[in-house]
Amino acid sequence: MINFFLFKGNKIIFVIILLLFSQMIFPITFKYNTGENLVKKKKEEDAREKQIKLLFEAIRKHNNKYVQFYLATEKNIRTRKMLTDKYINRSAGVYGVNLSESSLIEGDGRLVDINSKSQDGYTPIVVAIEAKNHEILKLLIENGANLYERHPIFNRTTVGTAAYYENEEAVEMLLKKDPKLANIGSTVDGWTPLEDATLKTNVKIVKILLQYGANPTITDKHGGTPMDMAVKFGKGEIVKILRDHIKANRSKYH
């Protein structure tokens, strides 16, 4: 009987030691992490969303100095790294007082990614096209913004969005960078930028699109073409432009 209790006692001591050892190696924090981490993550997401929305508001209002300061362009990334290395992360033995980022940059100094997306699906390039903010659109294109982003409501590409909003300068800027965008339609109805330009009776955009290789014979998901649309809605001038273009490029389209 005594041996049994000794064995049982030793077993309990062994279990306690094992628990203490495992706590040292793998701290038991899981029971707190779920709640605390979710709250922290939510706060970070809300702060990030607020920052993105402030950037979008600045793009829409053409407050371009604000946008240029907070957008994660190559220049800004290099500048922030230089400031961080020089004033915040000083090498050991370098004279001077280490500063915090908040003392160098007012407010939330974090940069907003070129292709950041808000919770409602907007990106800087789509907002810049809508707002006809050509200075920021140029900056985004130069810094590698995704030209294949789609409008969160209309599901059009950047060129399709520019055609829809009759943003002639944006259409040309985007096509100069990537002419293939001229023939990429909506994944919902298959409408191409040329169909949007035709419906809006925007002759200039129609001509720009054709110049960069838009195909007027491409059918959408309803079987229609830009020519069909031009005829149906009485867009006489565009009918002539499309007809002449197809005739001049007969071997290409047949």
Describe each model-derived feature in a short phrase:
Residues 32-118:
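N-terminal segments that cap or nucleate solenoid repeat domains
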Residues 51, 121, 154-155, 189-190, ...:
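Start-of-repeat signature of ankyrin repeats
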Residues 28-54, 212, 231-254:
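Ankyrin-repeat-protein effector appendages
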Residues 71-76, 105-112, 138-146, 172-181, ...:
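Ankyrin repeat domain, specifically the short helix-to-loop turn at the C-terminus of the second helix
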Residues 57-62, 127-133, 161-167, 196-202, ...:
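Ankyrin repeat A-helix N-terminal signature
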Residues 66, 135-136, 169-170, 204-205, ...:
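Conserved ankyrin/ankyrin-like repeat signature
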Residues 53-56, 89, 123-127, 157-161, ...:
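Ankyrin repeat (ANK) core detector
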Residues 79, 114-117, 147-151, 181-186, ...:
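Ankyrin repeat boundary signal
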